[in-house]
């Protein structure tokens, strides 16, 4: 420690280097998440939704057979596939962000939550 209880210049420099590295890693992670295609499929496999790692919709596949069903069944199948894709995508993002910030004890809403 330097005088007056302040950290020495070397510690400050090291902290800035670490912050810059995290920023670079975060930018790389953002690009990786954008390029991912994570899929969620409804229970009977007739509807599939793909999202990016950032929860952006990419595409939807609906089998012809389900279109012969009642409207509520089709809607429920699409919603189920969307929810599964979103769950997979958000879980992946949280995991990747925790890897990035590991050990820093950052309180990031939605990332460090146990919910």
From Swiss-Prot:
One of its GO terms (molecular function) is DNA binding. Keywords: Cytoplasm, DNA-binding. InterPro entries: YbaB-like_sf (IPR036894), YbaB/EbfC (IPR004401). It is found in: Cytoplasm, Nucleoid. It holds the Pfam family YbaB_DNA_bd. Binds to DNA and alters its conformation. May be involved in regulation of gene expression, nucleoid organization and DNA protection. Belongs to the YbaB/EbfC family. This is Nucleoid-associated protein Pro_0020. It comes from Prochlorococcus marinus (strain SARG / CCMP1375 / SS120).
């Amino acid at each position: 420690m330097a005088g007056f209880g302040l950290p020495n210049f070397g510690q400050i420099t090291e902290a800035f280097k670490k912050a810059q590295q995290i920023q670079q890693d975060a930018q790389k992670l953002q690009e990786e998440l954008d390029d991912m295609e994570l899929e969620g499929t409804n229970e009977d496999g007739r509807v599939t939704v793909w999202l990016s790692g950032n929860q952006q919709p990419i595409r939807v596949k609906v089998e012809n057979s389900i279109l012969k069903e009642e409207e509520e069944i089709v809607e429920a199948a699409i919603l189920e596939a969307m929810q599964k894709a979103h769950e997979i995508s958000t879980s992946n993002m949280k995991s990747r962000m925790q890897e990035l910030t590991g050990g820093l004890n950052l309180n990031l809403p939605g990332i460090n939550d146990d919910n």
